[in-house]
Amino acid sequence: MVNPRTKYTFIKSSILIFLIPLFFACSEAKKKEEPRTEPYKIIGYVAGYEDFNPALVDATKLTHINYAFANIVEGGVAFELKTDSVKISKLMGLKTVSPALKVLYSVGGWVWSDQFSHVAAFDWSRKKFAISCVQLMKKHGFDGVDLDWEYPGQRAEDNAFRPSDEENFTRLLAEIRIALDTQGKVDDTHYLLTIATGADQAYINHTDLGQAQKHLDFINVMCYDFYHGWHFQTGHHANLHPSDKEKFNGNSGLEAISRHLKAGVPANKLVMGIPFYGRQWEKVIADNESLYQPARSTGVIVPYWDIVEKLKSGNYKKMYDESAKSSYLWNAKDSIFISWETPKEIQLKTDFIKEKGMGGAMFWEYSLDKDQELLNKLYDSMN
């Protein structure tokens, strides 16, 4: 005969054993269902040197615009093109349509990064540069500053570089952050400081992103140009995953983001860069339908709208690398290979961004997608 007290205790214990995992399951479900409090960023670069009217930008589909580029002149920053002021004014006018829009200006880029190492090298030069950044920002009414230093500690387009760039880059960002916050207290606002970063391991090795990110609002990772204008062989220039067909030690968006996370950057500060252009190689060897094959030319930039026009000729065969999650085109008649981004890749990348808890997406560059096919897909996918 079972003791009633023992029987009651057994039943109570059984109920608890049943309810405890149910409680945690419900708690986990609740956690997963918690809505994202901060909207995803959609950041578009607008190049001042392109023949494009910034007033045509659809600001309703963007959270941020980065106007490119300001140059480094005599230790400070300055716009060099005669058309810059007019174009900047038109961008600022977009805030009447989208009051929450943030407009930043970007310093440097591939051509104008030659002086970064010098201005970052000394305490006095960092202070001078930071003050100049704030002055130019205030002059035109920008909401912040974006640095596109290509690249700290490495050779690029005739740029100066030195071993101390790694530490000096972080010091420069800290100085700019101080200057922006000082001005922000006066204006009762928060001014943004962001950077564009390289996607390869070499960039990680020559910077200290774990420390640098402490001074930054977010980081735009340039997840493109994995095969570019120096390569005399074809390849995916913006693939999300590594390709099982890879021959030349290429890169991928997944690997680029993983490197940044490992370097100490929080996922919500990482913004994935997406190209609104392709890379084209000519006189390509036809083996394997031209993927990862030698070419007589390097990978030149082709705007997305131009690729769409090329397809109308009927000479291009659409190809897809399932392992890399990347599209490419092969023109057997003219031996032309094009690596390009399509709405399919946009969807896959926005899914990846959400899965990883990242901050959003960035793209280069607005004028390269005239009919906004890629932008519309990006906006719909992120929302």
Describe the function of each predicted region.
Residues 32-137, 154, 164, 173, ...:
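Glycan-recognition patch characteristic of GH18 chitinases/ENGases
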Residues 367-383:
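Aromatic-rich peripheral "rim/lid" segments of glycoside hydrolase catalytic domains that contact
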Residues 46-61, 123-138, 201-211, 257, ...:
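Short, acidic/polar
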Residues 65, 105, 147, 176, ...:
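Conserved, mostly hydrophobic/aromatic
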Residues 24-25:
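C-terminal motif of bacterial Sec signal peptides marking the signal peptidase cleavage site
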Residues 74-86, 152-309:
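Substrate-binding surface in catalytic domains of secreted glycosidases
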Residues 91, 107, 227-230, 236-238, ...:
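Glycan-binding loop/region signatures in secreted carbohydrate-active enzymes
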Residues 1-9:
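N-terminal secretory signal peptides that target proteins for export/translocation
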